[in-house]
Amino acid sequence: MNILNNNLYGMDKEIYEIIKNEKLRQNNVIELIASENFVSSAVLEAQGSILTNKYAEGYPSKRFYNGCDEVDKAEVLAIERAKKLFNCKYANVQPHSGSQANQAVYLALLQPCDTILGMSLDSGGHLTHGAAPNISGKWFNTVAYNVDKETYLIDYDEIKRLAVLHNPKLLIAGFSAYPRKIDFARFREIADKVGAYLMADIAHIAGLVATGEHQSPIPYAHVVTSTTHKTLRGPRGGLILSDYEEIGKKINSALFPGLQGGPLMHVIAAKAVAFLENLQPEYKCYIKQVISNAKALAISLQERGYDILTGGTDNHIVLVDLRKDGITGKCAANSLDRAGITCNKNAIPFDTTSPFVTSGIRFGTSACTTKGFKEKDFVLIGHMVAEILDGLKNNEDNSKTEQKVLSEVKKLIKLFPFYD
């Protein structure tokens, strides 16, 4: 038997069944996890291609292995398309993830024990922005800024005060759970005042930046990092951008050989495909719809009496503060999951509960918008979510409400076919 001709079902029925069941799950739930999306069949085809066989340490035309002519072409396409999409001079498409993109920047620009200033976790920051359990919190002196205690908006005056007080080497503008726009120009002013590098982490809003629905950090940040999934709707991976070519050279060396070995050429090819899709006019319409859907969801939940953090949203993220309702984020997310609505528990600013419990939940509209959902559908989803949350108030057993909402979810999801 030639192993090269083995198909998955014949070789490994267990994994085959897992993939089949996961496809069924994705096809039968309302997916509201803000960091997830559905890629095109073209992206899947590229990522599942024979490019996975090719080892290609180094960069195009500067590899440590022979036989890289075709994968060089794929990586150059990905680089050039990324530069065009974000209107910048430098792009590195090799990071395996957004976390490793951030690590590459730290390795390129910082020394151990340098000070970094980033958003705190409960205010919406990411683990890699200096959180204690993360490598960024172990290798560097980290200082966290919070949002305003009344408005929950970024407090630029407080960031400036902390920057002057602590003199960071790197200032980070970015988030994983913040529903409003970021003023990158203000961040650059603060960075310049203390002589810091400015890194913008746009993992969540990259699609909005690429389409002009959010201010681009490229003219302001020394370096920009992102994931390539989420609103970019590509394969899971990382991306680094800059208009500073000298910084780009440092990052290239930091990523390889400093942090990674061989790049994942099948994933890079899939990134190239996604970037090409994102350069089409239809993608701008998609991002506009993502934002409109998020606003519709937020308003729907507000009308049912639920507190939306900051009073609304400017992007794909909707954060619900459940403190006054006496419901934990963990309990809400689990009950919604049983009703066919997938989201995640999420800390809210100044949250006093455990990060494994939390006082809030986070929704995102990117994935369902890819399936074709419009504002009216998200209004309906908002009412479904509210039904579940209403049922949880002073009630340990929410099973009847979960079954009722699950039947409504099934009716709605049938209107939006999945992969053929």
UniProtKB/Swiss-Prot annotation:
CDD domains, per the entry: SHMT (cd00378)
Record flagged with keyword Transferase: yes
Binding-site residues, (6S)-5,6,7,8-tetrahydrofolate: L121, G125, H126, L127, E246, S354, P355, F356
Modified residues (N6-(pyridoxal phosphate)lysine): K230
GO molecular function, one term: glycine hydroxymethyltransferase activity
Catalysed transformations (reactions): (6R)-5,10-methylene-5,6,7,8-tetrahydrofolate + glycine + H2O = (6S)-5,6,7,8-tetrahydrofolate + L-serine
Location (main, coarse): cytoplasm
Pathway, per record: One-carbon metabolism; tetrahydrofolate interconversion; Amino-acid biosynthesis; glycine biosynthesis; glycine from L-serine: step 1/1
Cofactor: pyridoxal 5'-phosphate
InterPro entries per record: PyrdxlP-dep_Trfase, PyrdxlP-dep_Trfase_major, PyrdxlP-dep_Trfase_small, Ser_HO-MeTrfase, Ser_HO-MeTrfase-like, Ser_HO-MeTrfase_PLP_BS, SHMT-like_dom
Gene Ontology cellular-component annotations: cytosol
EC numbers on record: 2.1.2.1
A Pfam family: SHMT
Residues at the site labelled Plays an important role in substrate specificity: H229
Oligomer and partners: Homodimer.
Protein family according to the UniProt entry: Belongs to the SHMT family.
Name of this protein: Serine hydroxymethyltransferase
Organism: Rickettsia typhi (strain ATCC VR-144 / Wilmington)
Highest classification ranks of the organism: Bacteria, Pseudomonadati, Pseudomonadota, Alphaproteobacteria, Rickettsiales
